[in-house]
Amino acid sequence: MAEKQIHTFQTEVSQLLDLMIHSLYSNKEIFLRELVSNSSDAVDKLKFKSLSDDTLIEGKEELQIHINTNKDASTITITDNGIGMTEAEVNKNIGTIANSGTKKFLKSLDEKQTKDSNLIGQFGVGFYSSFIVADKVELITRKAGSKSKKGTKWTSTGKGKYSIERVNCLNFGTSVTLHIKKDEKEFLDDYRLRGIISKYSDHITVPIMMIKASEDGKDIEYERINKANAFWSQDKRDLKQENYDEFYKSLTYDFEAPLTQLHNRVEGNIDYTSLLFIPSKAPHDMWEPKRKGGIKLYAKRVFIMEDNEALMPLYLRFVKGVIDTADLPLNVSREILQGNKVVDTIRKASVSRVLKELEKMAKNKPEDYEKFWQEFGMVMKEGVVEDFANKDKIAKLLRFTTNKSESAAQTATLECYVKSMQKDQKAIYYITAETYEAAKGSPHLEIFNQKDIEVLLLSDRVDEWMVNNFGKFEDVPLKSITKGDLEGLDSKEEKKAKEEVSKNFEKVIEKMQKILDTQVKEIKVSSRLSDSPSCLVVDENEMGGNMERIMKSLGQDVPDTKPILEINPNHPLVKKLKTKIDEDLVKVLFDQAVLSEGVQLKDPAEFVKRINKLIN
């Protein structure tokens, strides 16, 4: 390409640039953090690729990041000799955003969040933060290994368009020049920039260089302004909590300190250091299938990759941090990581440490654990099914709300449940529903409330899947109160009385069955109900109504099954049927049971007509 070409930004990028320029102003200094981070990543990538291709690094110069200011021209230039980019990569990485990160970033900003600069790094759109302080940005880059001495120049004022042209470029790497706005001149001050680097980028292992002040002002000599050491390699006895908090924030772009951290150095058959953090807030993309991993893997302090599944199971995907080992080859691939003995050993030990730390938090700092559970409880429930080896440990960390709880807050443990079980109780009872309110108000609970039996109220979206695969806790099985018969609840006298009542209602049930033949499998007298006239149940091995709803919402095929209608023989509406079978009343009893399940009626208007008719 010989001539300069003008391109238009993707719509989302234009929106983002407008946001950067006009809204995100509370913490303007983060532009430098973002650009230095990009340069550091570029150097890490070159180090990694050069392990298998040493021709990529031209000469013997040290890989560094240089920051230069020109007060006369009002510019700041950040230069690295990292991997660089091709013209196609410049277009792809800067002109457009292929993933949905920007859209979600824009969508997530409400009035309170507009000034929250930390969201920038979380959504991977940091380059555009340049326009917070600059009214023009120029980027010149040349890909490492390119035989041509030509590079690509990208220029934009952030107003909808950008230009690309081919230019002479002797060195590989990337240089970003910011033309600083008139009212942002503070960032041309040498000490101001050094302070920002010290605050955000001190731990970056790539040396960050700035011109050293000389007495005569003529000699140009660069000095390293960051410590350029691996933070995690320091002795934890020399570190304060504030040091950990600052490192965590710079690593994750989180604006809140973590709940806790685990810093371990292991020496033996496998040598490694791990520094793992448990955040205080859930990330925005925790439920994204393709979310970026939170653990960074280093081999001999060289960044290798981020891969949560290789280093941490999915149910612990919220854990952030670094793992550095000398026992992996530097050219390890993502494929080799899977099943690698070193990685498997580190993973197993790391999981064990995290679970022990959570157990310790739950015991010694219950308030912190309550905060943790509010943010990550749903994810932890996945672990019961995914991590069979640690199932018992995870099960003890689970928290629930029950029919005896004062609120929807999940604070009850399975251990406490089992200890407080009634003498002849043989199961941990639970009910699943779409909402806490639906579970709390379910007619299925009536007999349990009457007999003072505790029931877990499950309304998280993972609960149905969890309990269906849970098995037992301390040899006690879990039992749904909406499935099958409730054996063991009735005394001998109650059983005998129920059998008598059932006989008395045989003819009523027979006539009801004819009316509801296409809608129910069976109708029977209930041992669950004390106040409500009716409810729906399913057989023990059939899919419950809540699971059916979940499957349908996911577009899955659901078996066509009919529920069982249970009626309360002591309710006035049901007693009426002994005198006269009223078809409208029978259908209303069924519709009421459907509604109490949280399911929409197929014909609500017809239901209203029947209700009005019965009232009149």
From Swiss-Prot:
The annotated region (A) lies at 1-334
Cross-referenced Gene3D superfamilies, in alphabetical order? 3.30.230.80, 3.40.50.11260, Heat shock protein 90, C-terminal domain (1.20.120.790), Histidine kinase-like ATPase, C-terminal domain (3.30.565.10)
Tell me the keywords, alphabetical order: ATP-binding, Chaperone, Cytoplasm, Nucleotide-binding, Stress response
**Where is the region C?**
550-616
InterPro entries, A to Z:
HATPase_C_sf, Heat_shock_protein_90_CS, HSP90_C, Hsp90_fam, Hsp90_N, Ribosomal_Su5_D2-typ_SF
Assembly behavior: Homodimer.
Q: What is this protein called?
A: Chaperone protein HtpG
